[in-house]
């Protein structure tokens, strides 16, 4: 029997990353990357106990050596599995400060976690996606998670917006380079507050004013399953009452 194809989710916590992992684990083996093993260990156990296959690897996406070690481990554990999808979803680099209070470390840390992290994951994932394009039912896919800050540099968000703008530019360049080679590179703008454990207590005037992480995961799966005739580069997701 042929080995099950693989999806890699970089940036897994109890919210959106977990929802993406559960969605893709319905079809693929999944590898979950996060710096803190406590972010993925319960999810790995959950997926494996319900008939899926998941492994977690402690990885700092901003560190090329850490990413290389993770991909080397993936190659050893899944030597004959094609890479169907890679999702870049780290939440690092979020700082809200007046510009004059920002430190150089604040600024560089945001760029490292988002721009450098996206570069490091793409550098290792794209060769595998290119190898897989003739052996899986859907186009090999690389999705980057963006934010409101990907297209709007708001006051007090100079470091995060700079990092997210850079990540979006990387995604667009890769889409133009690798799309003609059959790889679907996409950037998803998550424009609003996501309904995750740390935002549960946040109250809003309107019902359903927070993004549902399971619905975000459904949208990512939709991107992955789009045919080559109909690639979407960018997808905006926001609650119906979100001003934009």
Give the residues covered by each predicted segment.
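Catalytic loop of short-chain dehydrogenase/reductase
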Residues: 92, 110, 130-166, 171-172, ...
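Substrate-binding pocket helix/loop in short-chain dehydrogenase/reductase
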Residues: 97-99, 103-111
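Conserved glycine-rich cofactor-binding loop
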Residues: 11-14
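C-terminal helical subdomain
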Residues: 180-183, 187-195, 200-244
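Conserved glycine-rich Rossmann-like NAD(P)H-binding loop of the short-chain dehydrogenase/reductase
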Residues: 27-42
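Conserved NAD(P)H cofactor-binding loop of Rossmann-fold oxidoreductase domains
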Residues: 87-96
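The beta1-alpha1 cofactor-binding region of Rossmann-like NAD(H)/NADP(H)-dependent oxidoreductases
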Residues: 38, 58-72, 104
């Amino acid at each position: 029997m042929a080995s099950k194809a693989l999806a890699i989710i970089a940036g897994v916590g109890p919210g959106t990353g977990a929802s993406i992992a559960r969605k893709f684990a319905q079809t693929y083996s999944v590898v979950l990357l996060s710096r803190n093993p406590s972010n993925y260990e319960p999810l790995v156990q959950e997926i494996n106990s319900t008939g899926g296959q998941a492994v977690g690897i402690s990885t700092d996406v901003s560190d090329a050596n850490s990413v290389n070690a993770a991909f080397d481990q993936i190659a050893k554990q899944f030597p004959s599995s094609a890479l169907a999808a890679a999702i870049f979803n780290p939440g690092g680099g979020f700082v809200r400060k007046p510009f004059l209070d920002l430190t150089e470390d604040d600024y560089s840390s945001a760029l490292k976690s988002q721009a450098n992290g996206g570069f490091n994951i793409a550098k290792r994932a794209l060769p595998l996606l290119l190898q897989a394009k003739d052996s899986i039912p859907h186009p090999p896919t690389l999705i980057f998670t963006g934010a409101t800050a990907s297209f709007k540099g708001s006051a007090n968000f100079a470091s995060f917006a700079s990092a997210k703008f850079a990540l979006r530019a990387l995604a667009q360049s890769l889409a133009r380079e690798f799309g003609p080679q059959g790889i679907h590179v996409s950037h998803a703008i998550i424009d609003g507050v996501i309904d995750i454990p740390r935002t549960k207590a946040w109250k809003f005037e309107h019902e359903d004013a927070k993004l549902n992480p399971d619905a975000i995961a459904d949208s990512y799966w939709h991107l992955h399953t789009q045919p080559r005739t109909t690639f979407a580069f960018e997808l905006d997701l926001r609650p119906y009452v979100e001003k934009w």
